Swiss-Prot record:
Key words of the record: Calcium, Disulfide bond, Glycoprotein, Glycosidase, Golgi apparatus, Hydrolase, Membrane, Metal-binding, Signal-anchor, Transmembrane, Transmembrane helix
Segments passing through the bilayer: 19-39
Gene name as annotated: alpha-Man-Ia
Pfam annotation, one family: Glyco_hydro_47
Protein name, entry field: Mannosyl-oligosaccharide alpha-1,2-mannosidase IA
Known cofactor(s): Ca(2+); Mg(2+)
Residue numbers on the Lumenal membrane side: 40-667
EC number of this enzyme: 3.2.1.113
Binding site for Ca(2+): T640
Tissue-specific expression: Complex spatial distribution during embryogenesis, including expression in lobula plate giant neurons. Also expressed in adult wing and eyes.
Functional pathway: Protein modification; protein glycosylation
């Protein structure tokens, strides 16, 4: 029996039509939903990977659209996942840098301003002796590895303070130890002081004054300065509010340099203006923690001024709603008014980012110790436990973790962007605890051994570098951000004598050397954002979007750490080369700018003076030319924004408070 169609025609034609529609629907479904199985997150099984490779040969653009920026189009043969990842990274960088990368170059770079070298500040001796005198093995051209010993527990001012509960105001009034403004000085008598060294130190101090004074003139209370246009700048990480990022980030550097007047101006602004109350800012949990909480904590350790403890706690409290996830892994962004938190849309299916949620431990642990409130430490311990217990592919930590499911996102690993400071905080949490947090040291060693095995490589030209790893494929590229790891490996070597000590030190020196090479292979003598290793090039950027330099500190951080640990003069020489390059290319009449292309003889400037230039770049350079007794590495551990935090049990400035027990336990 024939069914009659609505228009009264026989349905044999209708069946053919149905077939055709069915076919079209199946094809559409395949095109729409087939991609789900081919997304990078689902690369867990070989079968899917094989299918993906098969289709990739046929034309990857079917599933993964080509990058939109034609001008930045990578080489056609490149793995499309690398393209996707780079796009996401670019988005993150854009979010950090605001519109700076897109801006038309401003007219006129400005000439270096006249600078006035201040008379040397009176230098009080540092409170505790420097890194123990270590014998230098000069014959072999390098120092024997010194070991920064664990402090003797209980034998320190911090433990004495903790046994005498006081209010913060009482503590401050009763003259708790205060680091001398000027941060301590050179141990040598002035007449035996190396004149050149002192000149270099003073030069860096003058750079800080130049950066600060222009920020004050044109952007006071705003987040950052645009030196060319002489107006404020704010990256989206600061939530579009005037949070005085440069003040909070740069203040401990002023203190260390003994710039008292400037320091007092900054303190005054924080007291009168800094607050996150009654604003609805969407802040980056990570950036707010490392710059604002970290900066305030250091200032509290230096001075004992309760203002800084209160502000640190105030900021940390605003971040706490971000931790309310099924796993306790925090979201990346939080609204300071509503407490609504979320992740970046681009981060592997709603994942949190390893380098962000893994870089809270130092600040939150210290905040608990100085406030007596265990809550902050509990929050970061939860993150630690998740990361300890989760299965690590080949012993490595992927960059993305879903805070709802507790499962890894894309299997991309990096010691540069998206991964970097997680590894840093494992070692430093152990150091900060006075080498008692053994769990952290074990996790650090396990992670670094896997990285040594799977990601550290040597180029044909003999340069040691850390590759990114993406689904078992090495991308022979290193971010400038990963240049901090030279210092990290060296610090790992210097603090524990074991089977890996020599390897860590060798790799630490090798990476630092490679980062230096990336600088001196550019005509500006400043290093690019990322550099590659191929048959054609070594330690050079290849793509236009990785040729910029935004006043980053990581290479100088490694010079500083390696100098302290080896006393090899070359690290100071390299630091001075960098100072000259910064002065030649980045200095303007109204502050310091990054460069758009380090390979040009006369590169355009980017018109942003990053807050980390004052917090990190200038601080590390200043310390490089300072005596070891200024912030000795066996008493201070630097957070990832170069804010030094005291080491428990070794440092009189730890200022531990008595633990405040919950009411139910108090009786
Ligand atoms: C800083 O904000 C911190 O060092 C962070 O860990 C990553 N890099 C920037 C400066 O380059």
């Amino acid at each position: 029996m024939y069914r009659i169609s609505p228009i009264g025609r026989k349905s044999n034609f209708h069946s053919r039509e149905k077939c055709l529609i069915g076919l079209v629907l199946v094809t559409l479904c395949f095109l729409c939903f087939g991609g789900i199985f081919l997304l990078p997150d689902n690369f867990g099984s070989d079968r899917v990977l094989r299918v993906y490779k098969h289709f990739r040969k046929a034309g990857p653009e079917i599933f993964i659209p080509a990058p939109p920026l034609a001008a930045h189009a990578p080489h056609r043969s490149e793995d499309p996942h690398f393209i996707g990842d780079r796009q996401r990274l670019e988005q993150k960088i854009r979010a950090e840098l605001g519109d700076m990368l897109d801006e038309p170059p401003a007219a006129g770079g400005g000439e270096p301003g006249q600078f006035q070298v201040l008379a040397q500040q009176a230098q009080a001796p540092a409170p505790v002796a420097a890194l123990a005198d270590q014998p230098l093995d000069q014959d072999e051209g390098h120092a024997a590895i010194p070991v920064l010993a664990a402090p003797v527990q209980g034998d320190n001012a911090a433990s004495q303070a903790s046994s005498h509960p006081q209010s913060s105001a009482q503590q401050h009034n009763q003259q708790q130890p205060q680091l001398p403004l000027g941060g301590g000085g050179n141990d040598q008598a002035p007449d035996t002081l190396d004149a050149t060294l002192e000149e270099r130190r003073q030069k860096v101090k003058e750079m800080m004054e130049h950066a600060w004074h222009n920020y004050k003139l044109y952007a006071w209370g705003k987040n950052e300065l645009r030196p060319l246009s002489q107006r404020p700048h704010s990256a989206s990480i600061f939530g579009s509010y005037d949070l005085g990022a440069t003040i909070v980030d740069g203040l401990d550097t002023l203190y260390i340099m003994g710039l008292e007047k400037e320091y007092r101006e900054g303190r005054d602004w924080i007291e009168r203006k800094f607050s996150l109350d009654n604003i609805s800012a969407e802040l980056s949990v990570f950036e707010t923690n490392i710059r604002f909480v970290g900066g305030m904590l250091t200032l509290y350790a230096f001075t004992g001024d309760p203002l800084y403890k209160e502000k640190a706690q105030h900021v940390a409290d605003k971040l706490l709603p971000a931790f309310q996830t099924p796993t306790g892994i925090p979201y990346a962004l939080v609204n300071t008014k509503t407490g609504v938190a979320k992740n970046y849309g681009w981060a592997s299916g709603g994942s949190s980012i390893l380098s962000e949620f893994g870089t809270l431990h130092l600040e939150f642990a210290y905040l608990s110790d100085i406030t007596g409130n265990p809550l902050y430490r509990e929050r970061v311990q939860t993150i630690r436990q998740v990361l300890k217990e989760i299965e690590k592919p080949k012993g490595l930590y992927p960059n993305f973790l879903n805070p709802k499911t507790g499962k890894w996102g894309q299997l991309h690993m990096s010691l540069g962007a998206l991964g970097d400071s997680y590894y840093e905080y494992l070692l430093k949490a152990w150091l900060q605890s006075g080498q008692t947090d053994e769990e952290a040291r074990e996790m650090f060693d396990e992670a670094m051994l896997a990285i040594l095995d799977k990601m550290v490589r040597t180029s044909p030209g003999g340069l040691t570098y850390v590759s990114d790893l993406k689904f078992d494929r090495l991308e022979h590229k290193m971010d400038h951000l990963a240049c901090f790891s030279g210092g990290l490996f060296a610090l790992g070597a210097a603090t524990r004598q074991n089977d890996y000590t020599d390897k860590y030190m060798e790799v630490g020196k090798g990476i630092t050397n490679t980062c230096h090479e990336s600088y001196i292979r550019a005509p500006t003598q400043l290093g690019p954002e990322a550099f590659r290793f191929s048959e054609a090039v070594e330690a050079r950027a290849l793509r236009s979007q990785e040729k910029y330099y935004i006043l980053r500190p990581e290479t100088f951080e490694s010079y500083f750490v390696l100098w302290r640990l080896t006393h090899d003069q070359k690290y100071r020489d390299w630091g001075w080369e960098a100072v000259l390059a910064l002065e030649k290319h980045c200095r303007t009449a109204h502050g310091y700018c990054g460069l758009r292309n380090v390979y040009q003889q006369e590169p355009q400037k980017d018109d942003v003076q990053q807050s980390f230039f004052l917090a990190e770049t200038l601080k590390y350079l200043y310390l490089l030319f300072s005596d070891d007794s200024v912030l000795p590495l066996d008493e201070w551990v630097f957070n990832t924004e170069a804010h030094p935090l005291p080491i428990k049990g070794a440092n009189a400035y730890y200022r531990q408070a008595p633990v405040t027990l919950p009411v139910s336990n108090a009786s």
